[in-house]
Amino acid sequence: MVTLTFLLSAAYLLSGRVSAAPSSAGSKSCDTVDLGYQCSPATSHLWGQYSPFFSLEDELSVSSKLPKDCRITLVQVLSRHGARYPTSSKSKKYKKLVTAIQANATDFKGKFAFLKTYNYTLGADDLTPFGEQQLVNSGIKFYQRYKALARSVVPFIRASGSDRVIASGEKFIEGFQQAKLADPGATNRAAPAISVIIPESETFNNTLDHGVCTKFEASQLGDEVAANFTALFAPDIRARAEKHLPGVTLTDEDVVSLMDMCSFDTVARTSDASQLSPFCQLFTHNEWKKYNYLQSLGKYYGYGAGNPLGPAQGIGFTNELIARLTRSPVQDHTSTNSTLVSNPATFPLNATMYVDFSHDNSMVSIFFALGLYNGTEPLSRTSVESAKELDGYSASWVVPFGARAYFETMQCKSEKEPLVRALINDRVVPLHGCDVDKLGRCKLNDFVKGLSWARSGGNWGECFS
């Protein structure tokens, strides 16, 4: 274990990285505080993890409202960063593909005509302006939803040590504080700060970013399953594209790259992502369903229950959540950082609002470690299954850009013991492993008992065998 190198975010505040400038959150028609991204939903809600957050409140089987006889006593948020440019390696790959098409095509027919003059200008890794605004909106929504607590509380905030994750936390704070300052009923107007930034390293335990489980990191299962499914649906698209781009020879992987560009180009074009990229019109609605399922397969067999060590990557966070909900020391020997979780300054147990910022892959592992998708049958490797058929699981429903999970404890007049509830992107996910009620909740002690797999360390020992 390397020496502790967490950063107190006071330094970030002093350096001016957290902007206090007013924002026009919610004023754009495509992306709003309440509903998220709602433009071209037949396409944009099928971009897998590259979909911008959209509210699943209309997909509820039970109400997400707080029962009248209950009050929220604690809330934990786990958030993905906002919309970003492609990763550095993929940005280079996409640019190379566009350049090759332009160099080899003798004609650009039909909907592919735009490629003749398309100029690849996407950056790499960082949030787009739209992605920044997503997190401002998320901070506003969080304050509004939990106003009864937030008026008098300063949330404790952590972030994994990636620039886009840290920036997402800062933008969330901007939105949260904007909403608080606009609330005449707020009694504690102190601004939150990112109190802990956990380094991302193969040698540093980090519950918000996988990396230390050697056997898991070497696994190629998710990529293999995704490649096999791509081989089932991409050839027809490839043939059509080559017909419209004579002189060009594409691979199945190139087809997926062109589909990826639909989202990445859209979220980078304007600050509100209101202009749908011309890449999007190259594919049919049915093809977008297959693309969305491809991404769901990759996450399930890469980081979820489809990978023997997938859920194990979420054990550490699960045990941190248990500690926070029960106000007791962390009991874990997997990916938690013992130096951090044993220090009240870096892991307090007396807060009532916690906010953590992470990545999509780690969030998938965490959700499966928590058993939230225990009702999801193993995904078919050959045929598309909908989110409803998979008990609410799909990449776009679970980990879109700006995804957020709320874990609540509530005290109700009809119950002596606190109740626990989980919401993912505004959809109540009924708990598993405990005596769940009609509102998807379990009593706190029963919920903790139901997490016996994570509490015992699961199969973490296989990481190094």
Swiss-Prot record:
Disulphide-bridged cysteine pairs: 30-39, 70-412, 213-463, 262-280, 434-442
Molecular functions (GO terms): 3-phytase activity; acid phosphatase activity
GO cellular component, one term: extracellular region
Active site: 81
Biotechnology note: Phytic acid is the major storage form of phosphorus in plant seeds and, thus, in seed-based animal feed. Phytases are therefore of considerable economic interest.
EC main group: hydrolase
Residues that bind 1D-myo-inositol hexakisphosphate: 49-50, 80-81, 84, 87, 164, 209, 299, 359-360
Database matches in InterPro entries: Acid_Pase_AS, His_Pase_clade-2, His_PPase_superfam, Histidine_acid_Pase_euk
Keyword annotations: Disulfide bond, Glycoprotein, Hydrolase, Secreted, Signal
Coiled-coil residue spans: none
Temperature effects on activity: Able to withstand temperatures up to 100 degrees Celsius over a period of 20 minutes, with a loss of only 10% of the initial enzymatic activity.
Glycan attachment points: 104, 205, 228, 337, 350, 374
Major place of residence: secreted
Pfam families the record matches: His_Phos_2 (PF00328)
Signal peptide from the UniProt entry: 1-26
Activity-pH dependence: Highly active from pH 3 to 5 with 4-nitrophenyl phosphate as substrate, and from 2.5 to 7.5 with phytic acid.
Places the protein is found: Secreted
Lineage top rank: taxon: Eukaryota
Reactions catalysed, as given in the entry: 1D-myo-inositol hexakisphosphate + H2O = 1D-myo-inositol 1,2,4,5,6-pentakisphosphate + phosphate; 1D-myo-inositol 1,2,4,5,6-pentakisphosphate + H2O = 1D-myo-inositol 1,2,5,6-tetrakisphosphate + phosphate; 1D-myo-inositol 1,2,5,6-tetrakisphosphate + H2O = 1D-myo-inositol 1,2,6-trisphosphate + phosphate; 1D-myo-inositol 1,2,6-trisphosphate + H2O = 1D-myo-inositol 1,2-bisphosphate + phosphate
Family statement: Belongs to the histidine acid phosphatase family.
Name of the protein in question: Phytase A
